[in-house]
């Protein structure tokens, strides 16, 4: 595990080429007045993501409108689809009289070549099902059909409780570890390396520890970095996880 404190745009070039299997990051959306909430230079960020990711690596990036549209537009060629995280709470109460409250965040998935994809929650069928080609379907199968061995394939709506206010909430936009574990297990295998270049309080790192993945985390804010460092040291049982620091 590597934890780096400093500006990710300065530290990303230090990460070796083609060394990362997945980027999982909650980028700044640029929709609040928080001092850290400024959209990163996307052209430069994508150049670094392409460099550090393996050819079949995936980037799963949290977003919400209007940032979602800007994020997809920043790399339309490699954008593939979105997951939609349905929270157990709503936001936007101050504007409830003029617009609907929100309970969804987007997770935009990008890749160049087909990545690792491990559908979660599959149930093996007692008896395989053969599906013959259907000439009336707009989705034509190649060859003579297919055999279905599993059911309960995931759809794009993911329902996970958010992190409630209290001692377990370390960051204002903290994401739930079970959701991050789900994404890590979907796009990587045990022993793979996951990068979070805006790690906040380190939730992605916790997910990686619990699922047996390697983790590289970068955080600019020193206070949040120290929270993440302490949290990950406690989770892993190891001290001195810091690999470098940029003033």
Predicted features and spans:
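Core catalytic lobe of class I
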Residues: 1-218, 223-226
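S-adenosyl-L-methionine
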Residues: 1-12, 235-247
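Short functional hotspots where side chains directly engage DNA or cofactors
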Residues: 227, 231
